[in-house]
Amino acid sequence: MTDTYNLFQKGREALAKGRAGDATLALEKAKSREPDKASIREALGIAYFRTRRWPEAEAEFRAMLELAPADDYAHYALGRALEKQGKDSEANGHYKLASSLRPGDAHYASRIRDLG
């Protein structure tokens, strides 16, 4: 296993244990080594989101969409980060995209209704 993979796993384990702050440290190191890995960007975005670092979470989810434009979760997560910053109209657009990419997902549909 590579050092990057070990850092990624360490970050995911910290997230699973509710230690998002610790996760950011490992995941930032992993990202510096492999910035084009969508899985690292997603995990780091989640860690930033859980530590209420909304602009950083937004940046990671945008980067994730650059790498995987049809990723429904990336659109949903970006919408959540945008919503936390009061950017409801832009957030709603990403919720709609997420919902169109994964029709029938209750979480995605509920966010659209909430921002209606």
Language-model regions, residue ranges each:
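TPR-adjacent "capping" and linker segments in tetratricopeptide-repeat scaffold/adaptor proteins
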Residues: 1-6, 29
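Helix-start (N-cap) detector for alpha-helical repeat units in TPR-like alpha-solenoids
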Residues: 4, 38-39, 72-73, 106-107
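Structural signature of tandem alpha-helical TPR/SEL1-like repeats
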Residues: 16-29, 51-63, 85-97
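TPR/TPR-like (Sel1-like) alpha-helical repeat modules
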Residues: 83-107, 113-116
